[in-house]
Design a protein with these regions (language model features):
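S-adenosylmethionine
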Residues: 1-220
Length: 220
């Protein structure tokens, strides 16, 4: 962060697995894109870069005090196509209209980033049911906001199957018009399964991470 190049917005720092999720969105110039759980903003910056700063990017964040982090990141990198807003992704915002591409990088247990945040290992999962419900709501809201022929990416920084594959499986059962698409980007060690792509730290040398590309049958 002390680098002049960083201060000028010439680059931003992001984990490989996190960048993978943002790239899977496939955002393009001129599209309308949403990052529903955006702070601190790394994935939104990658989305804006893919869009070549053209189109409209809505970056929502539930915690109001974190919204300025998004605005600061956009200002530093010269991003003008994005709008940072305080928003509860678990509540549907029909007034936003439809989006061509949506990223749902949902709140999770964080078990994939224990190496960075060792305190996570001391937390129990007593509240996991509420977390799972919130993830389901965010994913469904993303689907409801998606335009015809759109693409939705569901991602977490955990390796907990209940938060990953099982969430996607349940979503597909409730939304049969969707299917899981195989990512064009292939990285060493990542595991492509029926319900998404899993990154395990000992195999990918990244954070533990999960991402699923969800498209409708008519998506080109």
């Amino acid at each position: 962060a002390a680098s002049r190049a960083f201060a000028r917005g010439l680059f931003h720092v992001q984990g490989l697995a996190s960048q993978f999720a943002a790239l899977c969105v496939g955002a393009q110039p001129g599209q309308k894109v949403a990052d529903l759980c955006a702070a601190p903003g790394g994935k939104s910056l990658t989305l804006a870069e893919c869009m070549q700063n053209q189109g409209k990017l809505i970056s929502g964040e539930y915690v109001e005090s974190r919204v300025p982090l998004l605005r600061k990141a956009f200002a530093r990198c010269g991003v003008t196509c994005a709008e940072a807003v305080q928003n509860d992704a678990a509540q549907l915002r029909s007034d936003w209209g439809k989006f061509d591409r949506i990223l749902c990088d949902v709140p999770c247990s964080g078990l994939g980033v224990i190496a960075k945040k060792p305190d996570i290992r001391y937390k129990d999962l007593d509240g996991i049911e509420n977390l799972l419900l919130s993830q389901q709501k965010i994913l469904q809201n993303g689907a409801d906001l998606l335009a015809e022929n759109g693409r939705l990416v569901y991602s977490t920084c955990t390796v907990n199957r209940d938060e990953n594959e099982e969430q996607v499986k349940t979503f597909l059962e409730n939304n049969p018009r969707f299917h899981v698409a195989v990512p064009a980007l292939q990285l060493p060690g990542m595991q492509q399964g029926e319900y998404g792509t899993l990154f395990l730290p000992h195999k990918t040398a990244t954070d533990g991470f999960f991402a699923a590309i969800l498209e409708t049958e008519s998506t080109q």
